[in-house]
Amino acid sequence: MAQIAESTGHHGAEEEHNCTGIDHRKLLMWVFLSTDCLFFGALISTYMVYRGQSLVGPYPVDIINIPITTISTFVLLCSSFAMVMALSNTNRDNLKGIRIWLAGTAIMGMIFIGFQIVEFTEFAMEGLLLSTNLFGTTFFTLTGFHGAHVSIGIVWLWVMFYQSFKGKVGSKTALNVELCGLYWHFVDIVWIVIFTLLYLVGGFDAGPPIVG
Amino acid sequence: MATVASKQSQNSMLSNIWGWITTVDHKRIGILYGVTAFVMFLVAGIEAGIMRWQLSMPGLDVVSPDVYNQMFTMHGTTMVFFAIMPLNAAFFNYIIPLAIGARDVAFPRLNAFSYWTFLAAVLFMNFGFVVGAVPDGGWFAYAPLSEQPYSTNQGMEFWSIGLMLAAVSSAVAGLNFIVTIVNLRAPGMSLMRMPVFIWMSFVVQILLAFAIPVIAVGLIELTMDRLFGTVFFKPSAGGDPILWQHLFWIFGHPEVYILILPPMGIISDVLPAFSKKPLFGYPFIVFSGIAIGLMGWAVWSHHMFTVGLGPIAVSVFTITTMLIAVPTGVKIFNWIGTLWGGSIEYKTPMLFAVGFIAMFIIGGLSGVSHAVAPSDYQQQDTYYIIAHIHYVLFGGAILGIFSGIYFWFPKVTGKLLNEKLGKYHFWITFVGMNLTFFPMHYLGMNGMPRRIYTYATEYGWDNLNALSSFGYVILFIAMVIFIVNVITSLKSGEDAGHDPWNAPGLEWTIASPPPVYNFSDLPVVEGRDPYWIIKRRAIAEGKELPGPQALVDPSTVHLPDPSYWPAFTSLGLLIFATGFMIEIPVWFVKYPIAIVGGLLVFVGILAWSNEPITREKNH
């Protein structure tokens, strides 16, 4: 920063002018995450509107495995703790801690995605595909887009892990880790909503009531 | 010698083009937006002309019914997403940083990315014309009509994926401008000192950022239905096409305000400048704009009164729709209050602004008439609706945008647009639009449905249709006059000076066209209408009126460097989108080109985030 100010001469001083004092990137991330709520909100609404509307099976009650997904949910929630530790180590410039906790977060995310792959494969083998019924359509789309969010987070974490070897991660650039953390926690929170609605609440749904 | 010279000019032209591709300057990006959007405005206008030609007499056979479907779909889609929205974006880009006293937007490279992605969307969707698969499901693409069995070619994929690209562009731009307006206002420019155009833009950015994800989900679901066999909107599997309508209009109604609020902001800046008095009831206009932004989320089902949502839903949405007319009415009264007792100068921007008020009132009134559900049952899907939307979007948005073009053209180019041609342009547009769109009210009331490609003479719609088509010709002439005006004024227009209108805004305190760094020293704002305060003080103290801010050597000002990564990333996104149009099964991968595009996007983002914003110079 000092170097940049030097090279910009007398017009450099006011360059740091910022009305709220909140870093642009941090503000951007908060606003982006709040708009992402609408994205998941619309997908979750689609799922809820179509709950119990599937005309043919398999229905959730036939294949949803709550215990298994509870384990992967637990892992994902733990990864949020690891993310906090990574940020805390970044602020303290503890390079070893940064690497351990960044990698830990990413690996826990990968375990979660691994569980999801196993789950999807199992569902497919039991006859539930995207095109089978409304349950398959909405379930795979919603959890798939969540999985994509997690995957982007994992790539981001590994990129940061790599950068820690280039000396680019530390207290001076802690915002980079913080932004990644904000994103990661958000994706976790969304999963809490999805897990509650799709597994704990909707996991026992069957087909539409048979009239007559 | 000659070849050397031509080679040199060729080189400089290439580097010039490269300069535009890699630019991160909000002013250049604004010009790119404006020019692209105006070209698309003309394209959509020609599509409208084909429709008016076809309808000018009963039983004509200018185009086939299929082509007619394509024309109304592309006319609506292009006008909304590729003409009015980006014309507004041109103003956001060019004016917002200048009017809040900033050197650029908060994320200059992201801004470039928005433009290139918008261009990718334009090219992608209109590529349908090249391969003969033009979208034909109407601009709101109601399922199941937009679904596979009813729309068999790739047209609707061009539509839905193209709109997704546009959605990425707009959402990113929205986020960027929210941060810009929150963080980068000049010292002293508190929220309640911002020009109304900035306020309205701010509301619009929030609407964009929050409404776009909803349509994105709708588009994803539609595209997945078409490509991956999901059953979101397929009644045969229990899916409900009404869900598409909800998703589309939950976005679609805020979208209406995304289109109209910026022109409202423009005329709120133009009216005071040509009445020589401050905007009447500034806080009322600001808060009514915010109220419109909030209430815009609670009215969407008035597009769906005839769907059969039941009496309670219909009543609720009738009431909310009528309520939203209140803040709009408040604005209109305040604009008229601004004119009251002012020393009014009828320059061209002012003519367009006053024309906006008059035409928007007509559009607003017909709007209230279909807020009433029983009355709407008669009007749904008739030309009455077409008349309404054109009074608010042509009489409103387009007139407001022209007002803004005439107002800020001298700032952008340093040249004034010709007043005489401008006045011809205004009056011919004014007469032309009323001739084109007013008869549509009667046509609608007489039962002419929208989207029919021809009609029999026995219905008695001949004369009014002929009149409407004649109006189109007049509008066409008006546009020609405008283009002639722009070209001749650019060549040999009168020099504008830095402040041709004696205007109140910060953008007039600097030279025209503005230097690359905008402000050599950031201005300090002492109140609303900051430049008027400075000028008034100079007059009171008997001093000379202050000139434009002195120019300095641009290299002494800290500016972001040009970058090709935004354009590269957009190109990756375009390839990603195109990948879904070309099925090449390789092993278990269905769309390998999409994977290539996705990787390019990844590379682009990575390189972009590793690129320093300003390289160290002379080191």
Regions found by a protein language model. Give the residues of each.
Chain B
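Membrane-embedded and interfacial regions of multi-pass energy-transducing membrane proteins
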Residues: A2-H619
